């Protein structure tokens, strides 16, 4: 997910998306430990996407104060 797409999302949508992506990330890590994924770089990409979303949420929080 690109930064521009993240910035266009509403705060509520962003919170829901972060929660869903964290669940997806945890499931992916568990699946990878059981049997290797075809593309283990997906784990890294998903982790970074979650970080981008959390960063945007934090920036919005600081701008509202």
Swiss-Prot record:
Domain of life: Bacteria
GO molecular function, one term: structural constituent of ribosome
Record's GO cellular component terms: ribonucleoprotein complex; ribosome
Record field: transmembrane: none
Database matches in CDD domains: Ribosomal_L29_HIP (cd00427)
Keywords carried by this UniProt record: Ribonucleoprotein, Ribosomal protein
Designated name of the protein: Large ribosomal subunit protein uL29
Organism of provenance: Bacteroides fragilis (strain ATCC 25285 / DSM 2151 / CCUG 4856 / JCM 11019 / LMG 10263 / NCTC 9343 / Onslow / VPI 2553 / EN-2)
């Amino acid at each position: 997910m690109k930064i521009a797409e993240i910035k266009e999302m509403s705060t509520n949508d962003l919170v829901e998306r972060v929660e869903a992506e964290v669940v997806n990330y945890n499931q992916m890590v568990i699946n990878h430990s059981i049997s290797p994924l075809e593309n283990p770089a997906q784990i890294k990409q998903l982790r970074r996407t979650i970080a981008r979303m959390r960063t945007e949420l934090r920036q919005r929080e600081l701008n509202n104060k």
